[in-house]
């Protein structure tokens, strides 16, 4: 008998779970770098608690960093789970972290959309608060401006756009990872019937496989 998970063999299921975890790790690192760049190029000049808009920028950036860390952790856990599928605590860890990733990424995406909308609505005044002239129409370097006002507006929107795309991608792959671990846990409210299907194989072809592979004597329950 051969164990199948969601229409996939155990080997294919492991590969899909591992690739999903790798994608989450990569996305998390890129998202973390993007948030760090935004902090270094923008927030260190405009992050003043007195300005509500600037404070909102800081909160969204902190949320982006937190989301990136959780995404990386969830991706690593998914990779480990692809090697140790029978571990029930690890299954629950990956499932809960994936759900947390999806929620954080969605919240982060909404926050980034709000930041972009507020920047357009205020014409970037919060970004130029550190400059004495305080107007986005004066696109020239000023002695009392600690940065180049001709670039901070476009740089902020560019970094926010990249971060928004990353958050959406993180949400998609986090949901996919949660779906895969959901199949392992056999939680019925979403899929109804069990996702485990049995298929007969030639006993000679299954010799030498590990405990999670097909066996000729009895089906294996994860």
Curated annotation (Swiss-Prot):
InterPro entries: Beta-casein-like. It is a multi-pass membrane protein. The chain crosses the membrane at residues 22-42, 62-82, 100-120, 155-175. Keywords: Membrane, Transmembrane, Transmembrane helix. It comes from the Eukaryota. It is found in: Membrane. One of its GO terms (cellular component) is membrane. PANTHER family: KERATINOCYTE-ASSOCIATED PROTEIN 3, TRANSMEMBRANE PROTEIN 54. Belongs to the TMEM54 family. This is Transmembrane protein 54. It comes from Homo sapiens (Human). The gene is TMEM54.
């Amino acid at each position: 008998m051969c164990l199948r998970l969601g229409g996939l063999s155990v080997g294919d299921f492991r590969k899909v779970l591992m690739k999903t975890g790798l994608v989450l790790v990569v996305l998390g690192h890129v998202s973390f770098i993007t948030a760090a760049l935004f902090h270094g190029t923008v927030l260190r000049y405009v992050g003043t608690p007195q300005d509500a808009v600037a404070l909102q920028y800081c909160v969204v950036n902190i949320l982006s960093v937190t989301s990136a860390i959780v995404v990386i952790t969830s991706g690593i856990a998914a990779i480990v789970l692809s090697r140790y599928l029978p571990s029930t605590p690890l299954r629950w860890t990956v499932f809960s972290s994936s759900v947390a990733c999806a929620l954080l990424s969605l919240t982060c995406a909404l926050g980034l959309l709000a930041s972009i909308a507020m920047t357009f609505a205020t014409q970037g005044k919060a970004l130029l608060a550190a400059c004495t002239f305080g107007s986005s129409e004066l696109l020239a370097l000023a002695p009392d401006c600690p940065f180049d006002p001709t670039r901070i507006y476009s740089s902020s929107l560019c970094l926010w756009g990249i971060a928004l795309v990353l958050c959406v991608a993180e949400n998609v792959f986090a949901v996919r990872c949660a779906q895969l671990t959901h199949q392992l846990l056999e939680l019925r409210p979403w899929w109804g019937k069990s996702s485990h299907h049995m298929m007969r194989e030639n006993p000679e072809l299954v010799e030498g496989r590990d405990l999670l592979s097909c066996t000729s004597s009895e089906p294996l329950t994860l």
